[in-house]
Swiss-Prot record:
UniProt-annotated binding residues for ATP: K46, G53, R54, G55, E99, A102, E107
Function: Succinyl-CoA synthetase functions in the citric acid cycle (TCA), coupling the hydrolysis of succinyl-CoA to the synthesis of either ATP or GTP and thus represents the only step of substrate-level phosphorylation in the TCA. The beta subunit provides nucleotide specificity of the enzyme and binds the substrate succinate, while the binding sites for coenzyme A and phosphate are found in the alpha subunit.
Species of the source: Dechloromonas aromatica (strain RCB)
Record: residues binding Mg(2+): N199, D213
Recorded name of the encoding gene: sucC
Descriptive protein name: Succinate--CoA ligase [ADP-forming] subunit beta
Amino acid sequence: MKIHEYQGKQILKKFGVTVPRGIHCTTVEDAVKAAETLGGKVWVVKAQIHAGGRGKGGGVKVATSLEKVREYAGQILGMQLVTHQTGPEGQKVRHLLIEEGADIKHEYYVAALTDRATQSVAIMASYEGGMDIEEVAHKTPEKIVKVFVNPLVGLTDEQALTLAKGMGMNEASIPQCIETLKSLYTCYMETDASLAEINPLIHEGDGTVKALDAKFNFDSNALYRQPEIVAMRDLDEEDPDEVEASQFDLAYISLDGNIGCLVNGAGLAMATMDTIKLFGAEPANFLDVGGGATTEKVTEAFKIMLKNPKVKGILVNIFGGIMKCDTIAEGVVAAAKLTHLSVPLVVRMKGTNEDLGKKILKDSGLPIISADSMAEAATKIVAAVK
């Protein structure tokens, strides 16, 4: 789960990280009032969407007058903001953050994240802030310093000092930087985040260390114990089909292809998508119905897939372990009838009650194409949609 920058800064502030004063707005008039309330001579008008690269896309503007605040707020609110993370369609801007200006002397990068390679929490820092860390890692990896944290001990002063010096932090700002890094780690752990990123972290002319941006990803499996985080969820920022799928406990992700996929198990789902691509087509989605699929879940899965006008065919690939093939077959038949299925449907199933499942499909009277292997299934659905 993701949240907006202004929400992320609220969380950081709660854990002791210094952030600029800012006010969340949803209208142009509120933006102007926010600037008046903040005072000063410089304000930053920032689009709030769940994507990075907002500045390059025109979603972050520095205003030096209230008239400019009004102008920029009017330009940004309601725009389709396109960044390298949104795709070509962009995301509609519904929220703004009006923030006081900062006396930036240098921009750094810091993040706490789950490092899958070492199965531990890593704290990363770099002198090269304010830009894509992936680009820094690719071109100048020596500019990134990383430490791994023992969760029984936490981020130590020694580790935080190593990070602060390794990232080239201004000498006078190192003590506050150490506290900021320790607060970031505590925040990451206590909110069940999988990523807590500040890019940029700055030091000002007087040495103050501030977080000028905040990006969080949270572990969806831990949200049951994070009600305050759940309350920050903005469904307008999420794919409506993915939101609907989550209500039926379906793991669904929209893609750009034309072959819908319904599979049980994430690994098999990824292998199915790879096989479709191998045979020259593109999957329209990732869809894992899990091990406890019911007729209702399968029907909803079909409905969600068929909402996508790009879907020209559906491939169902099931391994019957806990999930029995006959249960899936009954769900597929019911779903095909309820949705008045009009695109080719290929079903491949192996495992528990496989023969019974195939009989249910055959006796349904529906034009369902059967396959015995994943390669055969992919071949048949690719041929059917051409």
